[in-house]
Design a protein with these regions (language model features):
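Residue-level signature of mid-helix packing/kink "hotspots" within the transmembrane helices
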Residues: 1-9, 93-94
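Helix-breaking motifs and short loop linkers at transmembrane-helix boundaries and internal kinks
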Residues: 19, 40-45
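Structural signature of the two symmetry-related core transmembrane helices
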Residues: 22-36
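Short hydrophobic/alpha-helical segments at membrane-entry points of transmembrane helices
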Residues: 45-51, 175-176
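Cytoplasmic helix-loop-helix junction between adjacent transmembrane helices
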Residues: 50-91
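Helix-loop-helix hairpin linking two adjacent transmembrane segments in secondary transporters
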Residues: 85-135
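Juxtamembrane intracellular "pre-TM" segments in multi-pass secondary transporters
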Residues: 138-175
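Extracytoplasmic gate region of multi-pass secondary transporters
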Residues: 170-192
Length: 192
């Protein structure tokens, strides 16, 4: 849980600079491998180490998804597509509970890790070859320019790093972060 939380913080910054397809597929691929290992070990301390590694790499999923939505859709479209993404995340989680419970009931607890691990590894490979990085990577214009949403304001002189530091210092971001911490604590307590 803690490596996942810390990973969401740091991987959010890294995904701003990384190739989205490589970043997201690496996170999912390593998480898939960790799930395969979960299915073949029953040693508690090994399981704990694998769980921490898994948490870190799972945290590489949401940030690049948000970056991708931001890079490929205009400000007028983002709310719709972000809403679809958020809904699919929750629907997928619910279906995962049902699917994994069925797999465990039919084939045992190890299969509850191995089968999803194999599926996620296949999806990671598909993502690597199908998820597109930023439009500029392919010689396309920025989506804001393409959609005619270019701001008339002067370009900011701050670097991405400076903007990120400003965000971290923002009282509202700190409040939202604390709220999310408590929300996730309750969410995981309910799941358990």
């Amino acid at each position: 849980f803690y490596t996942y939380a810390f990973g969401k913080l740091t991987n959010g910054f890294l995904s701003d600079r990384a190739n989205i397809a490589k970043f997201m597929s690496t996170g999912l691929g390593v998480s898939a491998v960790m799930n395969l290992f979960f299915g073949v070990t029953s040693v508690f301390w090994i399981f704990g180490i694998l769980w921490a590694i898994n948490g870190w790499f799972q945290s590489m999923g949401s940030a690049p998804a948000v970056v991708s939505v931001t890079q490929w859709f205009s400000s007028k479209e983002r709310g719709t597509y972000y809403g679809i993404w958020a809904a699919s995340h929750n629907i997928g989680e619910g279906l995962t509970f049902i699917g994994t419970a069925s797999i465990v009931a039919l084939f045992g607890w190890q299969a509850g890790f191995i089968v999803p691990g194999v599926i996620c590894f296949i999806v990671a490979i598909i993502l690597l070859f199908s998820l597109q990085d930023r439009p500029e990577t392919y010689g396309l214009p920025n989506v804001s320019e393409y959609k005619g949403e270019v701001s008339t304001k002067k370009k900011a002189k701050k670097s991405i790093k400076d903007f990120q530091l400003d965000v971290l210092k923002s009282p509202i971001v700190i409040k939202i972060g604390l709220s999310a911490t408590f929300l996730y604590t309750v969410r995981y307590a309910i799941h358990s």
